[in-house]
Regions:
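Structured helix-beta-strand junction loops
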Residues: 30-31, 59-62, 86, 104, ...
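Short, well-structured N-terminal submotif of metal-dependent ribonuclease cores
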Residues: 1-35, 44-58
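Acidic, PIN/NYN-like endoribonuclease modules and their adjacent C-terminal/linker elements
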Residues: 1, 98-125
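Short secondary-structure transition/capping segments
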Residues: 48, 78, 120-123
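Short, hinge-like loop/turn segments at secondary-structure boundaries
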Residues: 50-54, 83-84, 124-125
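Active-site neighborhoods of divalent-metal-dependent phosphate/nucleic-acid chemistry enzymes
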Residues: 19, 64-111
Length: 125
């Protein structure tokens, strides 16, 4: 299973010709795609039109949901501090998603450059 970040989900859901969208399609078809509640919040926040709403609602019952539990929040807090100490400025939502992946020992599928800065710090915790 692989935790898919919002950036890659958007590529897939909007049908863009991209490597990230192709990777997500493979994960979805193989049953290996997962998301967390933070990703869902971001997706619902950016959904456009009736078609996207319908697709996302249908997918919610099909895609594995990785819990954002107490361990994730504790790790996210540590990761936020580590980012601050290293001068890395990234959205809080990306910190939570990275912490979710790290806490559950899942690789993260993304096409968001913020994770190139966050993930090495998460692995060091």
């Amino acid at each position: 299973m692989k935790l898919v970040d919002t950036s890659s989900w958007v590529e897939y859901l909007r049908g863009r010709e991209s490597e990230a969208g192709d990777r997500v399609e493979v994960l979805v078809l193989s049953g290996e795609a997962a998301w967390c509640d933070m990703t869902l919040v971001e997706l619902w926040h950016g959904v456009r039109g009736v078609k996207e709403k319908r697709e996302l609602a249908e997918m919610e019952s099909e895609i594995e949901r990785v819990p954002v539990n107490e361990a994730v929040w504790r790790l996210a807090s540590k990761l936020a501090l580590r980012c601050r100490e290293k001068g890395v400025t990234v959205p809080t939502s990306d910190i939570v998603i990275a912490a979710c992946g790290a806490a559950h020992k899942l690789e993260l599928e993304h096409c968001d450059g913020h994770f190139d800065d966050i993930l090495p710090l998460a692995k060091a915790l």
